[in-house]
Amino acid sequence: AEKYARAAAERRYVEARLAAMEPCEENLLFFEESLSPAALRALAEGGKTRCTGVCAAFCAEDGGYRYVMASETVDLRAAARSINAALSGRGGGASGMIQGSLLASREQIEEYFHGKIG
């Protein structure tokens, strides 16, 4: 029951974060302290409709970040190699969504994506 309560609380949190976001003409970045992989995916998926570039959701983990990135305009499968190379990352996925982990700092990530912070 506790697991379901946490999932429901995360869903409400993600919905509130997305509802508070104004659409933007750039990349959109979310930095979170602790979200499950499913909630991180939901944040990136929901955010991609609010930006013209990439919506990237990051969760702090082991001195780096887990990430999920989603986009309606950028081929992320093609971009994954350069993103991972620039930010000491591992991961990949499909053209519309990639996931993995990075060892970069928040400052390095923000500098790379030049996005609006959600």
Task: Mark where each language-model region is.
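Terminal appendage regions of diverse proteins
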Residues: A1-G118
